[in-house]
Amino acid sequence: MPETKDLILRKAVLTDWQDMLRNIWSHAESAKYMVWSTTETEEAAIARTERTIAYQAAHDYHWTVVEKASGQAIGWAGMEQHSDGVWGETGIAIGPAFVGKGYGTQLLNCLTDYARDQLGAKRFVACCNSKNQASRALQLRCGFTFTHTEEVFHPRDQITYTLEHYAKEL
């Protein structure tokens, strides 16, 4: 189970629903640049947690993020293999009350270190919506360099946006 100084990455459990609803899922600002919608009710949060548990069970490198100090589930982080020796993040998200504490940096560095040390990755890639200045700054702060942009259509919102791609040699 990967961890950082302040965070534990573990598989979701059903009791996470309250923390996740309170800390991230109900916050529109957290979903603004992501490919997910907010969750508003307890019933929806329980159902979403059940889907998360099933998804994480089928994907070895997708985790719920827990703050060590409080024991609360505050977000998620994941990665997947793109090709031989190349791994990439599939999303990092933490609730707004936990932003500005260095947790994003810890998470992205944790993923890259885990990919290199445990999975033999030689390169790690990440991306963000071009309007997401915080994600761009995070990737640059963690030593990633810009590689290219891509226009992406988002079917739920019926919009096209620019995705910026970054990479880091490990």
Predicted feature locations:
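A short helix-loop-beta-strand connector motif used in the catalytic cores of GNAT acetyltransferases and
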Residues: T52-T64
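Hydrophobic residues in alpha-helical segments
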Residues: I24-W25, M34, Q56-A57
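Acyl-donor (CoA/ACP) binding surface of acyl/acetyltransferases
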Residues: M1-D19, N23-E29, H62, V66-L170
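Conserved GNAT-fold acetyl-CoA-binding loop/helix
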Residues: E29-R51
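A generic secondary-structure signal
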Residues: R51-T52, Y114
